[in-house]
């Protein structure tokens, strides 16, 4: 455990870690201070940071299990001590660390008797397990325990619904949040009109991120949310002449974008954010990492520019075009790129 004496700066606003410890492989703790703040600022920042820490940071989880030999979720399998439901609950608790975008596949194939733990999961190279000792199942007989897994990176919760069930496939209620808990408190000091505040922020994580990494990512996400407000132009905030659609000719992708850009003054392109257009999370994350936040940002990039984005594919460009057609009510010819 690392703990530092709290010293209050009277000059530059600054974050500082004053306590850090690792309680287990799946429980990290960090305590930070931000000072000096004017009266009222600490609560504003503390509330925003807590919400960003708990709701805006992405995590990686097992979201589905595939096995054709299992009749239903609450069945038991000969030679396995746990029920299928208990195995699903154990898989739900597996903590993963990754740079994954979207979904990926993994698997387990173990011959009994013996214990199946997290270290038996065969993962893609860009995904790793935080705690290899996490228990999955106990094999009591000489049987082959082979299942497929679906891994996904997302944020918040993923609640299984009836339409998510498929033959031989069982969804898991996934909790993507790497931050287990976050609290903030405020200490005031000074006299009269000179009162200032110190913000104390406590962060607990599941080990896939350190509290310091979580704080950095939450801060980055908050900054990204506010950046568009720095570029607002008054003349682009509202639709003009009741123009709700943009007619485009069936040209190439580049020509379509050029046509939209030419007509951009007729629509509030800067007030339409890409997260409003139902883009898949992988495409959205790629665009966000390239500082593309609004429809105007998107239309200022050519097809060649988009293809230079890391992890971007031609299919993604087609999907973006489909979104443009949907939201601008455009009837375009389907050209091959």
Curated annotation (Swiss-Prot):
Catalytic activity: RNA(n) + a ribonucleoside 5'-triphosphate = RNA(n+1) + diphosphate
Primary location recorded for the protein, binned into one broad class: plastid
One Gene Ontology cellular component: DNA-directed RNA polymerase complex
Signal peptide: none
Subcellular location: Plastid, Chloroplast
GO molecular function (one): DNA-directed RNA polymerase activity
UniProt-annotated stretches for the region Alpha C-terminal domain (alpha-CTD): 265-337
Keyword line: Chloroplast, DNA-directed RNA polymerase, Nucleotidyltransferase, Plastid, Transcription, Transferase
Region annotated Alpha N-terminal domain (alpha-NTD), chain positions: 1-233
One GO process term, biological-process aspect: DNA-templated transcription
EC number: 2.7.7.6
Superkingdom of the organism of origin: Eukaryota
Pfam families in the record: RNA_pol_A_bac, RNA_pol_A_CTD, RNA_pol_L
This protein's domain notes: The N-terminal domain is essential for RNAP assembly and basal transcription, whereas the C-terminal domain is involved in interaction with transcriptional regulators and with upstream promoter elements.
Family from the record: Belongs to the RNA polymerase alpha chain family.
HAMAP family: RNApol_bact_RpoA
Known role: DNA-dependent RNA polymerase catalyzes the transcription of DNA into RNA using the four ribonucleoside triphosphates as substrates.
Assembly behavior: In plastids the minimal PEP RNA polymerase catalytic core is composed of four subunits: alpha, beta, beta', and beta''. When a (nuclear-encoded) sigma factor is associated with the core the holoenzyme is formed, which can initiate transcription.
Protein name: DNA-directed RNA polymerase subunit alpha
Name of the gene encoding the protein in the UniProt record: rpoA
């Amino acid at each position: 455990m690392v703990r530092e004496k709290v010293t209050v700066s009277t000059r530059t606003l600054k974050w500082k870690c004053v306590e850090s410890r690792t309680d287990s492989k799946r429980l990290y703790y960090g305590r930070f201070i931000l000072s000096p703040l004017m009266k009222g600022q600490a609560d504003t920042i503390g509330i925003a940071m807590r919400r960003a820490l708990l709701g805006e940071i992405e995590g990686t989880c097992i979201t589905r299990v595939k096995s054709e030999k299992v009749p239903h979720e609450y069945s038991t399998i000969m030679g396995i001590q746990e029920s299928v439901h208990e195995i699903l609950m154990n898989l739900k608790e597996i903590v993963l660390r990754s740079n994954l975008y979207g979904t990926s596949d993994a698997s387990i194939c173990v011959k009994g008797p013996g214990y199946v733990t997290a270290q038996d999961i065969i993962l893609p190279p860009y995904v790793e397990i935080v705690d290899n000792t996490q228990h999955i199942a106990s094999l009591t007989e000489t049987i082959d325990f082979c299942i497929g897994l679906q891994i996904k990176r997302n944020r918040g919760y993923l609640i299984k619904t009836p339409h998510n069930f498929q033959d031989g496939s069982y969804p898991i209620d996934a909790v993507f949040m790497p931050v287990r808990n976050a609290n903030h408190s405020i200490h005031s000091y000074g006299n009269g009109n000179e009162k200032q505040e110190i913000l104390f922020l406590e962060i607990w994580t599941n080990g896939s991120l350190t509290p310091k990494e979580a704080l950095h990512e939450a801060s980055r996400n908050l900054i990204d949310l506010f950046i568009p407000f720095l570029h607002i132009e008054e003349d682009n905030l509202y639709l003009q002449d009741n123009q709700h659609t943009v007619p485009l000719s069936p040209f190439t992708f580049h020509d379509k974008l050029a046509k939209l850009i030419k007509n951009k003054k007729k629509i509030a392109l800067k007030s339409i954010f890409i997260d409003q257009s139902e883009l898949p999370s992988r495409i959205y994350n790629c665009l966000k990492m390239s500082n593309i936040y609004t429809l105007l940002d998107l239309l200022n990039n050519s097809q060649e520019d988009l293809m230079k984005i890391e992890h971007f594919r031609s299919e993604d460009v087609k999907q973006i075009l489909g979104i443009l057609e949907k939201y601008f009510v455009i009837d375009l010819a389907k050209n091959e790129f």
